[in-house]
């Protein structure tokens, strides 16, 4: 039996974990991202049949039609997800292949994706099963809450224990999620 061929679009948290999970199940995994720096940062933790490649339109056109599973995990903070896979690519996939569009909360990154629900999670389009449930973590609220807490708790404890300025000095990544305000900005008399 040949290993499943999995194409993961996006090397963020979701894409990286999906790729690692598929590789641990002996799938042949191609992880694509547009950032060579992001892909390089993941190299040390790569296992099994997982290859990472800088994404391009031509590469997608070659890989998607041959995939057994395509996972769309791109994230555009504050915006709509780019459509990376067009209907023509989906039409070329083998019947029974599967698409999971995690980016559906941002409009989806697969042209044929339509939001589905936890009660009716899949739809078949061009012979390909699509799973595009919005708020996927909602299916496992306890587990997703534990995961969120495990990631955010160190930051919360750092801010609570040392104050914001020292926490930002120790963890500069906090700067990207701070909203700066001043008393002058809250002056409603000047509006």
Model-derived regions, located:
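Conserved small/polar residues in nucleotide/adenosyl-binding loops
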Residues: 180-187
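Glycine/threonine-rich flexible loop motifs
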Residues: 77-85, 109-114
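Internal hydrophobic alpha-helix adjacent to the cofactor/substrate pocket in enzyme cavities
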Residues: 153-163
